[in-house]
C-alpha cells in the first residue's frame, strides 16, 4: 500500500519502520515541525511536509499518529477530505474522523512504543472501522505489519 503518515513521534517512528519492513511504500511524513518530519522521512526516501499547509500525496491509507489531544483539530488540516484515514490513539473514538472522511477507523498498537527501541517486538493491533469495508482494509493492513 501507499502510505502517508501524519506525525513524527514515537508511534509514527515505530509504525513507519513496520510499514517499510512489510513492503509498503511511505510517500510522505507530515508533522507540525517540518524538520522533524524530514528526519523521519529521510529514513524511508519519503517526502516531508508540514501539517500547517500540507499538500498530501495520493495514498491508499493516511495514518494519523499524533497526540490524542491533536485529533480534535484534524478537520482544520486540508487534504484529508474523503481519504481513507486511520488514527492510532486508543483513548479516542474512531468517530473523531467522521467529518473528515467517509471511510475511517483505528489502528491502535496495544503496547507502549518508543522511537529509541533497537529491535521492534511483534506488536498486536486493535482495529476498528466505521463500516465493514473500512474494518476489512484496516485488518488486512494490520496483518502485514
Question: Which residues make up each language-model segment?
Answer:
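Short active-site oxyanion
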Residues: 1, 24-28, 58-62, 81-85, ...
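NAD(P)+-binding Rossmann beta1-loop-alpha1 motif at the extreme N-terminus of oxidoreductases
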Residues: 1-48
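Cofactor-binding loop segments of dinucleotide-utilizing enzymes, especially the Rossmann-like FAD-
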Residues: 8, 31-32, 88-90, 128-130
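Loop/helix-junction capping segments adjacent to catalytic residues or to phosphate/diphosphate-binding pockets
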Residues: 13, 72, 132-135
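Short, solvent-exposed amphipathic alpha-helical segments in soluble enzyme
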Residues: 20, 79-80, 142-144
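Rossmann-like NAD(P)(H) cofactor-binding subdomain of soluble oxidoreductases
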Residues: 34, 44-118, 138
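Internal alpha-helical scaffold of NAD(P)-dependent oxidoreductase catalytic cores
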Residues: 36-43, 119-145
